[in-house]
Structures are given as structure tokens and as C-alpha cells.
Amino acid sequence: MKRSTCVLICLLCALPFILFDAFVYLHFTRRLMNPFGKEMQEKSIVLQDFLPFDEGSRIVKVRAAEEYRFASGDVMPVLDGATALYPVYSAFFNAMYPVGTCSFNGADFEEGSFLQKRNTGGAFKAIVNGTADIIFCASPSQEQLEYAAQNGVELVLVPIGFEAFVFLVNDSNPVVSLTVEEVRDIYSGKVKNWLEVGGDNSPISAITRPRGSGSQTAMISFMNGQPIKPANSIYAGRTLGYSFRYYVDGIVASKNIRLLELNGVYPSKENIRNHTYPIVSNFYAIYRKTDSEREDIQKVIAFVLSEQGQQIVEQSSYISIN
């Protein structure tokens, strides 16, 4: 048999499988929209958009009162933190620090910059090893606290604002609300199909986050001791994901994603402020306890908790502590 004939036969045999895969993608897989897939990643925070001292920056621009400002030559703390809080602490930096203290090479902050953005896991390592002086993050995970303890570092956590932990689905999903227990049952593997919680007959693809990330730490706390063991593959059906409200609404802002009500309450700013939404948590300015007497660190903390600092928190779409 000629080689060309063999190739043709192979292609004809493969064609039904190719058509089937295309059908599945168009009518099933594509509509799932992994909340942590490529679309979410492409819409992640772009550092350049929130740089201090930049006329086109999207940060909240407030000039700190004289008592809170640093001058060139002063001892100044290095600020770092979680990705979702970067626009907030970059605005703090812009308000307090002199021009020339932030070094950005077009892709990342340089080693000598007083402003850094290493994400949650990297920021906790930085505060422990001394390469950052104040970090802005959600509550640390048990592993992060143990890492600090193992290295002889005790941390001080100062609440500076409120945020909501939210659950999200593709906008085509008919489910608009889940209860706390339903979410826990889904992520512990007890509930496997959307039909069981008022949706259509489709497997639930429950997405998880990397261990050590702020959202995964929040999810572990939310599960209240139950192990996270989703029943289905992440490619099995309509997805359910979780994150913090600001990241989903303020950064991703995709029409394909919808936040769910929890116990019948939508995570609006008002419902977060009055604590009717079930999962409201603090985020913190965190520093080493041994640095408690450092005037530069206490100056930053005082500004963050001042009326101007809390204005930055509020206008950055978070909820102020005061």
C-alpha cells in the first residue's frame, strides 16, 4: 500500500475524533471559563499601571501631611505585599516617599527599590529574612507562621481594612447563590453536580489555588477543618472558583465571570461594611516585632490608619477599617 494511501486512511480514521473534540470544546469546555486560567492571568495586575510618581498611574493620589512624609536621606522601610493589595500600598508609597526611592526596570522592581511586589508567599519570606520591612497581606497561613517561628521571627499584624472572600462562576451558570454549607460540601467532595444545588445537570469543576497564596489560606480557613478534596477533575464541568472581591471586580472585571451570593447575600461594598456578607476578613500591615520601636515603620503605620490613609483604602475599592 502506498504511503500516501496510508496517510489518507489515518486522517479519515482520526477525523471523527477531531470533530468530536471540536464539538466538546465549542459546546461544553469553552463555556466553562476557568476562573484561574489564561483569561484571568492576562488580566492580572500590571505593575506599570499602579506605579508611584507616575502621572498616568491608576493609584489613588493623595499627598501625605508633612508629619508623615519622608525626605531623601531618611531611614525608610521597604514595602512589599500581596498582588491584590499592590495598588493600595503603592498609593501609600506615593503619598509618603520622595521621588527616586522606587526603581522599576519595566518588568519588575529592582533590588534597591523601597517598593517591591513579591506576592503573598514571597512577601512573607521577605519579612522574615529582612528584605522587606512592612508587608501588606491577608492573614498568614499556618505554614507561614511556622516558617517565621522557625526563623525566630515574631510578626505584628495591624488591621488596616476589610475585604470579602468570594466565590465565582461563569456568567452562563444559572446558579446565583450558594450557602456556606453547600460550598463546603462541594469542596469536600460531597456534592458533585450543579443539579444538587439548584443548577443544571453538569459536574462541578471546583478550582483550587496554590498552597501559600492568600486566597488558598482563606479557603482553608473557610473550610473549618474539612479537607479540600473536590470530587471532579478541573476539566469535568462547569467551574466554581474563589478569590478576593477586589481582584475579581477591580482587576479582572470580566463579563464572563459572576460573583455568587453566599447565604443569599451579595458581596457588595455595603454588605461587606455592615458584615452581613458571611466572609469578611481583615487585611494587614505586617512587620517584625523586633522593629516595633523603629520610627520609620511606625510613621507608615500611623499614616495608613490616618484619615488620609484610610481614604486611600476606601478609594482603592476596599473597605476602610475606620
Region locations from a protein language model:
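Exported/periplasmic ABC-transporter solute-binding proteins
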Residues: K2-E163, L168-N322
